[in-house]
From Swiss-Prot:
Keywords: Cytoplasm, Hydrolase, RNA-binding, tRNA-binding. It comes from Azotobacter vinelandii (strain DJ / ATCC BAA-1303). It catalyses: an N-acyl-L-alpha-aminoacyl-tRNA + H2O = an N-acyl-L-amino acid + a tRNA + H(+). This is Peptidyl-tRNA hydrolase. It is an enzyme of class 3 (hydrolase). Belongs to the PTH family.
Amino acid sequence: MTAVQLIVGLGNPGPEYEQTRHNAGALFVERVASAKGVRLSADKKYFGLVGKFSHQGRDVRLLIPTTYMNRSGQSVAALANFFRIPPAAILVAHDELDMPPGTARLKQGGGHGGHNGLRDIIAQFGNQNSFYRLRLGIGHPGDKNLVSGFVLGRAPRSEQEKLEACIDFALDVLPDMLDGNWTRAMQQLHSRKA
């Protein structure tokens, strides 16, 4: 059971990307910070917004990279290397095209599935992909040529509400994730109906 030491929320920086589908991971970390009473602050050393809270006597760090999505690994590696956090103690929250809005799944390892943020993190860790992922469903536009505009667009209210509900449920499961009780966290999260 590997306990989480770092939670990363992927997204793009700037007001033009706020509330876009691609920023679902960043929204999750913002919600964690709010629930834990943590103020995220910019730190140039880690190329992101960072925060920290205590869980059962140990530090858990939060990170939202302020690099663009395809350079997320620069931020994650900078913080993880400084604090000597192994990939298996990292949870990366990100948007997932291949799942409908309102669904969330946990996974350890695997490829990047075309997600540029995951691709860069894996590359920065020297192809070590043992970090955990919280995959937040955003749906698919139905045509691969429409993906870029889709992920960079804002979801209609009904989809956004589903995403926010699944993030709230993931927050309920967070204590198990933090403790490394991955099987129990997966059972709870994966049994939820969107």
